[in-house]
Regions:
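Core catalytic lobe of class I
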Residues: 1-144
């Protein structure tokens, strides 16, 4: 596990010809005027991520709208699915007079391999720590 500026850490790992199973990062969303909160150019980011990730690895990125939609569109070919992180503390108090507080964050998963059983070599997924919420899951009443 590495902690640091992701572009610098990725450059270091690439220079050592290291390939990794997973990349989990929380890039800046450009939702404030702080100097550190500037979107990393997507082309540069994807170039580095793809040099580092193993062919069957997962790239997991955090975000909020509208950044999340832009991030998904930046690499639709490798986008697989989202998780929603329900936070224990809401955020966005500085904008509370203008919009609802945010209680969740998007977690977007990208991979070079597919995420469905019909793929030649689908991504591995081993759920852990699942909590039974006792809800009946019903099928949609509309057939597509």
């Amino acid at each position: 596990m590495y902690k640091g500026d992701c572009l610098q850490v990725m450059d270091y790992l690439i220079s050592k010809n290291i390939k990794v199973d997973a990349i989990i990062t929380d890039p800046p969303y450009a939702i404030t005027n702080f100097s550190w909160d500037q979107i990393i150019p997507f082309n540069e980011m994807w170039d580095k991520l793809l040099k580092l990730i193993k062919d069957d690895g997962a790239i997991v990125l955090f975000g909020n709208e509208p950044f999340s939609s832009n991030l998904r569109r930046s690499n639709e070919k490798l986008y697989r699915y989202d998780w929603k992180w329900l936070k224990t503390q809401v955020t966005g108090f500085q904008n509370a007079k203008f919009q609802p507080l945010r209680c969740y964050e998007d977690i977007m998963v990208f991979s070079k391999v597919g995420a469905v059983s019909s793929c030649k070599k689908p991504m591995c997924y081993y759920p852990q720590g699942l909590v039974n919420i006792n809800l009946k899951v019903m099928r949609s009443s509309v057939d597509y």
